[in-house]
Amino acid sequence: MKKQADYIKRIEIKGLWGRKNISWDLRADVNILSGVNGIGKSTILNNSVRYLNELEGHALTNGVQPGVSFVFSPEDANFIRFDVIRSFDRPLINSGLLEKIGNSNVKTELDWQLYLLQRRYLDYQVNIGNRIIELLTSGVIEDQARAAEVSRPKTKFQDLMDDLFSETGKKINRRSNEILFEQDGDILTPYQLSSGEKQMLVILLTVLVQDNQPFALLMDA
């Protein structure tokens, strides 16, 4: 039986590059892996992501995989929900992918992440909309009060975006189902933001669409 973890307590990698053993004890909130270029930070992240992907759908005792193992909290959990953010704004070079997308605005890796997140954001809105309708029509007074709480994370996300972009006069368009911004009377798509603004949007939007569920966010910056 699958049991979801709240967070990863430890990552262990045996024989990294055939010579190093890595054991990384993790906090429940924020963990930073730092060091000079070439020390293996991205390699550790990539190995972790690869084996976390393999865990999905498999009842593996406490996350053990050949060469890589995870200790979860609680320790009898055998998988974890996770997302990966890579904040490099390099041009996309996969011509087949660009043709498949059919969106000329998607030109960089950050654009691609935003494109995928837009679709998840639409699904998120449908889900919370359905929950609000269910609560409002239940006939239970307490449920009607809870309905306002369902949309609170989305409102908080919008408020945060407005605050972060306040110096450039950008505000998120709260009437649109898609992520759009207003600036001096113009409508901007996320693809028109600066690289730094795209990075902030990707991080906050990734967290929002988790819908308050426990998950691990891995970032390569």
What are these regions (language model features)?
Residues I22-A28, E182, L208-Q210:
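Phosphate-binding P-loop
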Residues L33:
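Hydrophobic anchor at the beta1->P-loop junction of P-loop NTPases
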Residues M1-A5, K9-K14, D25, N46-Q192:
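Phosphate-coordinating catalytic segments in nucleotide- and nucleic-acid-processing enzymes
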Residues G38-I39:
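ATP-binding Walker
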Residues Y51, L193-L218:
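GG-anchored amphipathic helix commonly corresponding to the ABC/SMC/Rad50 NBD signature/C-loop
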Residues S42:
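Walker A/P-loop
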Residues M161, M219-A221:
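Conserved Walker B
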